[in-house]
């Protein structure tokens, strides 16, 4: 199976590498073309524009940083729309809002192409291990045709119906994750300021009902003030903002998420946006100094 892949950031690079390792022919594009070099060493082909990738491949996957990037790749000069046509499938796995997905869907289908949104739950390590959770919506036939690729990229794929539902589900998942991370950060800081061992707190949490992979995986490095970026904080804050907008649309009160968003915004103002989202703990520390 031959696929195109647009966007080689932390997630896109790991995902496209998995496709290559599992026998897929992969043609890649990235705005900074030098990021394609390692994938070329593993057998990927490179195109100089998204349009060229679409022209070459029946199926093209995109994994981009935000709604602006997702729209740019589709609508700008040399973009997806220049070559999308009947028989072509476009799978956008970026985390965007439902409005952005709907706009892309309308443009793709208006040219005769087929569209699936497929945002993922999971960060760098699950992407490298092929253990993402795929939250797909849109063209059902294209979803089913994409299963061989999805099975390489993730441990389970959900089909959620019409376009927009995948985006909404992803934002809700990330809103919960961000709120949990902020509460977790407050707990670690509170333990430390109370004269208790935050490492002991991790052990206690791991033995009880609140045990989870995020606390177990992030806690030790947070206690060492180390935040290698698996999921950049700036993207977590973007998702919190979009989730709060979804709450506004549906008249859902979300004070916990709103407070967490403020902490992530504070962390960004401290210059921590490119670090892992667990660096939000530094904003919690700052607020208590």
Swiss-Prot record:
GO terms for cellular component: cytosol. PANTHER family: GLYOXYLATE_SUCCINIC SEMIALDEHYDE REDUCTASE 1 (PTHR43580:SF9), OXIDOREDUCTASE GLYR1-RELATED (PTHR43580). The keyword Oxidoreductase applies. This is Glyoxylate/succinic semialdehyde reductase 1. NADP(+) binds at residues 4-18, 95, 238. Keywords: Acetylation, Cytoplasm, NAD, NADP, Oxidoreductase, Stress response. Gene3D superfamilies: N-(1-d-carboxylethyl)-l-norvaline Dehydrogenase, domain 2, NAD(P)-binding Rossmann-like Domain. The lineage of its organism: Eukaryota, Viridiplantae, Streptophyta, Embryophyta, Tracheophyta. One of its GO terms (biological process) is response to oxidative stress. It catalyses: glycolate + NADP(+) = glyoxylate + NADPH + H(+); 4-hydroxybutanoate + NADP(+) = succinate semialdehyde + NADPH + H(+). Belongs to the HIBADH-related family. NP60 subfamily. The keyword Signal does not apply. The active site is at 170. Its main location: cytoplasm. Induction: By salinity, drought, submergence, cold and heat stresses, and ozone. It comes from the Eukaryota. It comes from Arabidopsis thaliana. It is found in: Cytoplasm, Cytosol. Follows a sequentially ordered Bi-Bi catalytic mechanism involving the complexation of NADPH to the enzyme before glyoxylate or SSA, and the release of NADP(+) before glycolate or gamma-hydroxybutyrate, respectively. Although GLYR1 acts as an aldo/keto reductase, it has no significant homology with either mammalian and bacterial NADPH-dependent SSA reductases.
């Amino acid at each position: 199976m031959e696929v195109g892949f647009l966007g080689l950031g932390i997630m896109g690079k790991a995902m496209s590498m998995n496709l290559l390792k599992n026998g897929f022919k992969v043609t890649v594009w990235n705005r900074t073309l030098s990021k394609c070099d390692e994938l070329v060493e593993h057998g990927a082909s490179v195109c100089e524009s998204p349009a060229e990738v679409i022209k070459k491949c029946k199926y093209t996957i995109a994994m981009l940083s935000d709604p602006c990037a997702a729209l740019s790749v589709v609508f700008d000069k040399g973009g997806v729309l220049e070559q999308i046509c009947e028989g072509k499938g476009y799978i956008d796995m970026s985390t965007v809002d439902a409005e952005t997905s709907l706009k892309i869907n309308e443009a793709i289908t208006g040219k005769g192409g087929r569209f699936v949104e497929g945002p993922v739950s999971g960060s760098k390590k699950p992407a490298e291990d092929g253990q993402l959770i795929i939250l797909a919506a849109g063209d059902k036939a294209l979803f089913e045709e994409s299963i061989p690729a999805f099975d390489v990229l993730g441990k389970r794929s959900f089909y959620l119906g019409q376009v927009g539902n995948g985006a909404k589900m992803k934002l809700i998942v990330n809103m919960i994750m961000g709120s949990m991370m902020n509460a977790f950060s407050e707990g670690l800081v509170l333990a430390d300021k109370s004269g208790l061992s935050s490492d002991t707190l991790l052990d206690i949490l791991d033995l009880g009902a609140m045990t989870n992979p995020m606390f177990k995986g992030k806690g030790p490095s947070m206690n060492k003030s180390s935040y290698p970026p698996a999921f950049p904080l700036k993207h977590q804050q973007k998702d919190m903002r979009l989730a709060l907008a979804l709450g506004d649309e549906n008249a859902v009160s979300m004070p916990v998420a709103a407070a967490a968003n403020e902490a992530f915004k504070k962390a960004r103002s401290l210059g921590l946006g490119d670090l892992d989202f667990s660096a939000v703990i530094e904003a919690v520390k700052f607020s208590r100094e």
